Swiss-Prot record:
NCBIfam families assigned to the protein according to its UniProt record, in alphabetical order: lspA
Classification of source organism: Bacteria, Pseudomonadati, Pseudomonadota, Betaproteobacteria, Burkholderiales
One MF annotation (Gene Ontology) recorded for this entry: aspartic-type endopeptidase activity
Alphabetically ordered keywords of this record: Aspartyl protease, Cell inner membrane, Cell membrane, Hydrolase, Membrane, Protease, Transmembrane, Transmembrane helix
Pfam families reported for this sequence: Peptidase_A8
Assigned protein family: Belongs to the peptidase A8 family.
Active site per UniProt: 126, 144
Main location: membrane
Protein known as: Lipoprotein signal peptidase
Length: 166
């Protein structure tokens, strides 16, 4: 008898999109709070190694291409929209793989959080500033955190899957 693959239920995307929406909600609310509280460039030390700041990132991670002429806003927006389409396809197809899907949902929420910033403000709002003495890690936001956590979980899931197939 031949094995057949059954399609996931039509609602298979719902829980994963729910996670993405929660990420977007927390990301956007945190950015609104920072925008209402801080002037551009202002910083408030919370601990000896952590500040809240308000900076604008017109580029990508770590300010990559932030000094370009403006084309990067639309390029990174298009990249975020493209990633959204690919991730939704993967979630629809592999929604039964929980860790894989949670990983993608976090990445999706983070990507869309930053796409919203680019469309609304023309740049991404960053405000989390970790530092050690005078050395500062580049400021980031909750969307970036979700993308990073999702990427780490994705790598972990893949390593686990590879080890399981041996």
């Amino acid at each position: 008898m031949a094995k057949t693959l059954s399609k996931p239920a039509s609602g298979a995307l719902a829980p994963w999109l729910g996670i993405s929406l929660i990420v977007i909600l927390f990301d956007q609310l945190s950015k609104i709070a920072i925008l209402k509280t801080f002037a551009y460039g202002a910083q408030h030390a919370l601990t000896s190694f952590f500040n809240l700041v308000l900076v604008y990132n017109r580029g990508a991670a770590f300010g990559f291409l932030s000094t370009a002429s403006g084309w990067q806003r639309w390029a990174f927006t298009a990249l975020g929209v493209g990633a959204t389409l690919v991730i939704c396809f993967l979630l629809k197809r592999h929604g039964h793989q929980r860790l894989f899907s949670v990983s993608l949902a976090l990445i999706l929420g983070g990507a869309l959080g930053n796409v919203i910033d680019r469309l609304v403000y023309g740049h991404v709002i960053d405000f989390l500033d970790f530092h050690l003495g005078a050395w500062h890690f580049p400021a980031f936001n909750l969307a970036d955190s979700a993308i990073t956590i999702g990427a780490v979980l994705l790598i972990y899931d893949e390593l686990r899957r590879v080890r399981g197939s041996r």
